[in-house]
Structures are given as C-alpha cells and as structure tokens.
Regions:
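Conserved beta-strand-loop-alpha-helix junction that forms the acyl-donor binding cleft
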Residues: 111-121, 137-142
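Conserved active-site alpha-helix within GNAT-family acetyltransferase domains
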Residues: 90, 115-133
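Conserved GNAT acetyl-CoA-binding A-motif
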Residues: 102-112
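Active-site acidic-Proline motif in GNAT/NAT acetyltransferases
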Residues: 80-82, 86, 115-116
Length: 148
C-alpha cells in the first residue's frame, strides 16, 4: 500500500465519490458532509479537497476546511466503501496528518464526527485524536476531536 495525495479531485473521480456517497444513502451523506449539502451529492459540492490514491487507484478524499489560530480543521474524509476495512483509512489519515504537521503554522488538527458514527470515531481515536468537546446540535449530537 502506497498512499499519496493530490490537490483537487478530477471530474471522473468526483463522479466516483458521488456514486459512493449516493449509494450509501441520505443518512450516511448527512453524517459524512453534513445537512447543508443536499442529497444527492453533486460535483459542485466537492471543492477544496485532496484526492487519496493507493498506488495509481483513486480510493477516497479528505478536505482541509480551515486554518484558525494554528489549528487545521479537516473533514469530509471518505474511503471507497469497497476499500474500507483494509487499513487504507488509517494509513491515509496518518499520512495526511503527518504532511499537515510539516507546516510550521499548524500546531493541532481538529475534526467533527457525529456521535452515531462510531466506526469513524474509533478510527480517529485510534490515530491519536481525543474528544475535546461534545456538541448538542439541533439535529444530532457530535464530538469535536483534536490531535496535537
């Protein structure tokens, strides 16, 4: 397994992401990208992301959402459902975090995950993220996790 990243997502790969997300349904999509982006996912909603490749195969994406006060907030991390449970998610997250910390302006990395998404929460905690806040949102509860 050789994970690498490319800034942006090609139209062809964005179509794969839309297919993957749409095939998992509205509930999954709201957990993954939030309720502001309507189901069915379209290409226009995928700006500002990095493509994740295993060798030459496109396997997922991750987004740098914002940098505030030396904290990089990331999100919309998604691995092809057919490639999950193979260690790609952990390896991709470790490498992305490692590359982010090479930037001297970044001291911490945060992300949000819905409480019901235990699989994602377990992955983030396994990779060293810690829950720093529980947020009661109008629709559902989520955790804010941070890695320093």
């Amino acid at each position: 397994m050789t994970i690498r990243f490319e800034e942006k997502v090609s139209t062809e790969n964005a179509q794969f992401v839309c297919q993957w997300s749409n095939s998992l349904g509205k509930v999954f999509q709201e957990q993954w990208i939030g309720p502001r982006i309507p189901f069915l996912l379209t290409l226009q909603a995928l700006e500002g992301v990095f493509s994740i490749f295993d060798e030459q195969e496109f396997v997922g994406l991750i987004q740098k959402i914002r940098l505030e006060d030396s904290n990089l907030h990331i999100g919309r991390f998604f691995i092809n459902p057919q490639k999950q449970e193979q260690g790609l998610g952990g390896q991709a997250l470790r490498k992305f975090v490692s590359l982010a910390f090479e930037n001297e302006d970044i001291d911490s990395i945060s992300l949000n995950v819905f409480e019901a998404n235990q699989r994602a929460q377990n992955l983030y905690q396994k990779e060293g993220f810690e829950i720093v806040q529980m947020v009661e949102a109008p629709v559902r509860k989520y955790s804010r996790l941070k890695l320093e």
